[in-house]
């Protein structure tokens, strides 16, 4: 039996650690390429804005907002401002924000990682910035492929990310608990946070 088939059979039992010991799902489905097999966000890794590989297991026990960002979008100002505010108010409660620059929508994130980091510093960003990625298509980062197929990560009219600043709320176990469209400002997430802290 292939590892992929085994993981698909066991996934209902392992999903988000429902019946598994912590880390077991990651042991079973450790291949970064077999993203469908993952049971939580914590099984992935991504390069930060400085190019260092980050194991997302570091977010175990934290509530996370994962979003794609762009510097030249009409929604940039409101999203960066509100994300910075949410992080400032709730970081001590266990909120973490993971921002992934993406140039797939109107080519509104054309800069280098260094330029994006400098832009974000203008908003006094203290949350975690990652290297530029794709969120749709064959070249999409495995984390984003995985989030889009989760029961509470699916979109309206298909699972593809529609635009900049699509946001996913992730619980302490690394499970997607809600997806917010690009027109929903970060402040709407605030009402959902207390349920997961």
Curated annotation (Swiss-Prot):
Any one of the GO BP annotations: response to oxidative stress
Enzyme class (EC, first level): oxidoreductase
Pfam families documented for this protein: GSHPx (PF00255)
PTM sites of type Phosphoserine: 40
Gene3D superfamilies (UniProt xref): Glutaredoxin
Source taxon at top rank: Eukaryota
Catalytic activity, as annotated: a hydroperoxy polyunsaturated fatty acid + 2 glutathione = a hydroxy polyunsaturated fatty acid + glutathione disulfide + H2O; (12S)-hydroperoxy-(5Z,8Z,10E,14Z)-eicosatetraenoate + 2 glutathione = (12S)-hydroxy-(5Z,8Z,10E,14Z)-eicosatetraenoate + glutathione disulfide + H2O; (13S)-hydroperoxy-(9Z,11E)-octadecadienoate + 2 glutathione = (13S)-hydroxy-(9Z,11E)-octadecadienoate + glutathione disulfide + H2O
InterPro entries per record: Glutathione_peroxidase, GPX_AS, GPX_CS, Thioredoxin-like_sf
MF GO annotations: glutathione peroxidase activity; phospholipid-hydroperoxide glutathione peroxidase activity
Catalytic activity, EC: 1.11.1.12
Complexes and interactors: Monomer. Has a tendency to form higher mass oligomers. Interacts with FUNDC1; this interaction promotes GPX4 recruitment into mitochondria through TOM/TIM complex where it is degraded by mitophagy.
Family statement: Belongs to the glutathione peroxidase family.
Name of the protein in its database record: Phospholipid hydroperoxide glutathione peroxidase
Organism annotation: Sapajus apella (Brown-capped capuchin)
